[in-house]
A protein has these predicted regions:
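N-proximal low-complexity "stem/linker" segments adjacent to membrane-targeting elements
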Residues: 2-57, 62
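Active-site nucleotide-sugar/metal-binding loop of Leloir-type enzymes
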Residues: 65-78
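Residue-level detector of anion-binding/catalytic polar loops
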Residues: 49, 85, 102, 212, ...
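C-terminal catalytic/acceptor-binding lobe
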Residues: 11-13, 162-249
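Anion (oxyanion) recognition and catalysis
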Residues: 44, 97, 207
C-alpha cells in the first residue's frame, strides 16, 4: 500500500494539520521511534503540516493535560496521542484521518503476565451485537488514548461545557508559559468501587458533551513491555483460537 500517495489523494484539497503528542515516563521505546520516523516521512511526503510534542512525567493524566494545552495554543486541526511504548504502521494513522471522526482510537492489547491474553480496554454498548461500519470502524463507549486522534473542535466544546475544569494552580507552574491554559480533561476516577484511567474519564466527558467515539479495528499495534503484545482489535470479534501472540523483547 502506497500510504504517501493515499495521503495525497485524500487530503490534497484541505490538508489537515496534526499535532502529535507523546507522554513519556522516562524513555521512548526504539520500536516507537522507528514508527514515528515512518509516519513523519509519510506526512512530509504528503505535504501535511505536523509537529511532535513530548511531555516527561510519571503521571500520564497530567502529561496529557499539558500536551492538550500546548496543542490548543497552536492552530492544528487534530491532536494525535501516541504513547511511547506503541509500535505501529503509518496506515493506522491514515485510517483514522480518513474516517474524519471527532474522536477515534486504535485499540491495543493490554500488557499482562500472560502473553497469550488478548484483552483490550474498550467498552462497547452491546458487545454481543457489534455493528462494524464502513472502513473498519466500530462505535464504542470508551477506549485507550495511547493511539487516539481528536479534532480541535472537541476541546473547544469541552472548554465551553466545562469551564470549571480549568486548572488554576498546578505543580511546576513556573516551568510553563503564563498564558498556558490547562484543563483537567484527563483524570483518573474512582466511583462505586471501580477505578478507571484518564482515557475513560475523557471519553465519558466527551460523550456527555454529545460526541461519539469510534475505534479502528483493522490496524495491528504492538504494545511493548517485557513482551511485545501484538494484536488487531478486529480479531477479538472472530472465533477464539489457541495460540500465543506475545514475543519476548
Amino acid at each position: 500500500m502506497m500510504v504517501a500517495a493515499t495521503f495525497l489523494d485524500v487530503f490534497v484539497m484541505n490538508k489537515p494539520s496534526i499535532h502529535i503528542a507523546m507522554p513519556c515516563y522516562d524513555s521512548v521505546k526504539i520500536h516507537t521511534m522507528i514508527s514515528m520516523l515512518k509516519i513523519v516521512k509519510e506526512l512530509t511526503m504528503a505535504g501535511l503540516k505536523f509537529e511532535l510534542n513530548t511531555m516527561k512525567s510519571p503521571y500520564v493524566a497530567y502529561a496529557r493535560n499539558i500536551l492538550t494545552a500546548r496543542f490548543l495554543q497552536r492552530d492544528e486541526d487534530y491532536l494525535l496521542f501516541v504513547d511511547s511504548d506503541l509500535e505501529f504502521e503509518p496506515e493506522c494513522v491514515l485510517k483514522m484521518l480518513i474516517a474524519q471522526k471527532d474522536i477515534m482510537c486504535t485499540p491495543y492489547r493490554v500488557k499482562t503476565n500472560d502473553p497469550a491474553s488478548t484483552k483490550y480496554t474498550v467498552s462497547i454498548e452491546d458487545p454481543k451485537n457489534v455493528k462494524i461500519l464502513q472502513g473498519g470502524l466500530v462505535e464504542i463507549n470508551n477506549g485507550p488514548a495511547g493511539m487516539m486522534l481528536i479534532k480541535r473542535t472537541v476541546f473547544e466544546k469541552l472548554i465551553k461545557d466545562y469551564p470549571e475544569k480549568e486548572i488554576k494552580v498546578h505543580p511546576n507552574e513556573d516551568t510553563f508559559p503564563k498564558d498556558l491554559r490547562i484543563y483537567n480533561f484527563w483524570d483518573c476516577n474512582f466511583k462505586d468501587g471501580t477505578w478507571t484511567g484518564e482515557d475513560i474519564y475523557f471519553c465519558d466527558l466527551a460523550r456527555q458533551s454529545g460526541f461519539k467515539i469510534y475505534a479502528n479495528i483493522d490496524s495491528t499495534l504492538i504494545h511493548h513491555g517485557s513482551f511485545g503484545y501484538k494484536g488487531k482489535y478486529g480479531d477479538s470479534f472472530k472465533p477464539k483460537t489457541n495460540g500465543t501472540n506475545g514475543t519476548k523483547n
